[in-house]
């Protein structure tokens, strides 16, 4: 096999004993990877093609029992999402690219990425992303971060309090949620409580639709606390509290590029 240089032997037939097999549902419904080291394989062909290493990553995920993938970011996600879907994987999105939309500065490099000034253009990118993926199996990631995976207020200084920041993110999530629901009534949603978003959530400044899966992240070193960079307090708990309702997930870093 590719990852351990195993050579597959072709057999003319395979015997499968007759019988009844009972399989239990997986305890974790959605199980997958984000290819965090995508830049390390983006120019690798393994002597075959640029797609081949990605196909082998997706195959490895399937062999490990996974069913979901974030197939890279930016241009990569639009190249490799169809390959992942064709191999039977569901697709979701990096939290810096809600709904899998194109980054604002990629689409409008000469404009300031301010939702106050250009909200209609952000909405257009999100709507285009919904149209592009509406016929695929997608877990829709909603939220709002700044360009380059930073807090959005680094691009828009008008939002200078937690209340203002949380209100805008909450309103945007509701809008994204409605966009998808209009096209896909039974859509599944998630959002990442990571970095500054975790702080706003803990402060009670975020209003998230009740059926959205809340994804909690470790700090990059395996501890379920706030991110090691850019947070005011690096020890904020990043786990749901006892009695919390709704659905929850974990974004756990095996590597941190």
Stretch-by-stretch model annotation:
Residues 49-79, 83-92, 135:
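Catalytic domains of carbohydrate-active enzymes, especially glycoside hydrolases
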Residues 6-16, 74, 78-86, 113-245:
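Gly/Pro-rich turn-and-neighbor structural signature
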Residues 1-59, 63, 147, 175:
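Solvent-exposed alpha-helical segments and adjacent loops
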Residues 28, 32-33, 37-51, 215, ...:
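Active-site-adjacent "gating/activation" loops or surface patches in catalytic cores
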Residues 86, 90, 94-119:
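Acidic/aromatic-lined carbohydrate-recognition and catalytic surfaces
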Residues 31-35, 62, 68-71, 91-94, ...:
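Hydrophobic faces of well-ordered beta-strands that scaffold small-molecule active sites
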Residues 103-107, 148-154, 244-257:
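Active-site clefts of carbohydrate-active enzymes
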Residues 38-45, 66, 111-113, 153-163, ...:
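Glycine- and acidic
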